Amino acid sequence: MTTLRLLISDSYDPWFNLAVEEYIFRQMPATQRVLFLWRNADTVVIGRAQNPWKECNTRRMEEDNVRLARRSSGGGAVFHDLGNTCFTFMAGKPEYDKTISTHIVLAALNSLGVMADASGRNDLVVKTPDGDRKVSGSAYRETKDRGFHHGTLLLNADLSRLANYLNPDKKKLAAKGITSVRSRVANLTELLPGITHEQVCQAVTEAFFAHYGERIDAEVISPDKTPDLPNFTETFARQSSWEWNFGQAPAFSHLLDERFTWGGVELHFDVEKGVITRAQAFTDSLNPAPLEALAGRLQGCQYRADKLQETCEALIATFPEQESELRELANWVAGAVR
């Protein structure tokens, strides 16, 4: 009986695809070797321990209908669109070895006519007259008895959009320079004009089969067709939840300040697991009572624009004479945390 499993997703939903990855990883026998091929529509994917409010321009993402998805592996934030082909290799220990999966991807690229090399811990690069250029990045996760290696291959990704949705580390940009970061990335279409997602998936699949000396039929999956995934809805609900994608952020503090015609306002938040654990409000308004009441009500509130706006506007019933000020405050707070 084969120990291989091949899954190909027909869905572009990042929450679905990452939920499938998580489910298969948890449920597979430790003797199984899995290849999962997928791609996401416009999404910022962040590492397991990252803070989306720090890493991402969440307001612009909301305006452009770009999703946020937290993965279960570490590492940094990346932008996915349909110009990326994503792969995940899973295996039980001691067989799990990321050098094997890296070898399979390199063999797939070689079969397409692209000579690439592994560089550092996470990247695959091609040599060009302008120097090495990255065509693939990876991340990894291991538990006691299994591990996975997942990554992307840049086919025809819109590289310019990365800067639209990520808030770069100013120190990192100052050290590397924006042009050097941009220039070291390449799409495979620059090397192989016309290359498609389907061709890349086929090449990776054939390299996977060749390495293990077995062939199996692919399981094509989508939200309407999830073979052998009992109780998958629970995993999907977690992966798509605000509590996972935003609420799993490390604890942080946020200071908001603004001057209105009726007075200056400072709001100090301490946030843990996406919930405000401590709030302080300072103002030189002639009527500070609404702000003082707001600080108490914000404690325990989720750190999300709609909830903060609702909490601010709920004060109107108590302070109807300050309705215009409170609506102005509510709109400002909601906009500041988007």
Swiss-Prot record:
CDD domains referenced in this protein's UniProt entry, alphabetically: LplA
Reaction(s) catalysed by this chain's protein: L-lysyl-[lipoyl-carrier protein] + (R)-lipoate + ATP = N(6)-[(R)-lipoyl]-L-lysyl-[lipoyl-carrier protein] + AMP + diphosphate + H(+)
One of the GO biological process terms: protein modification process
Cystine bridges: none
Residues the record lists as binding (R)-lipoate: K134
Subcellular location field: Cytoplasm
Family: Belongs to the LplA family.
Note: In the transfer reaction, the free carboxyl group of lipoic acid is attached via an amide linkage to the epsilon-amino group of a specific lysine residue of lipoyl domains of lipoate-dependent enzymes.
Name of this protein: Lipoate-protein ligase A
Organism: Salmonella paratyphi A (strain AKU_12601)
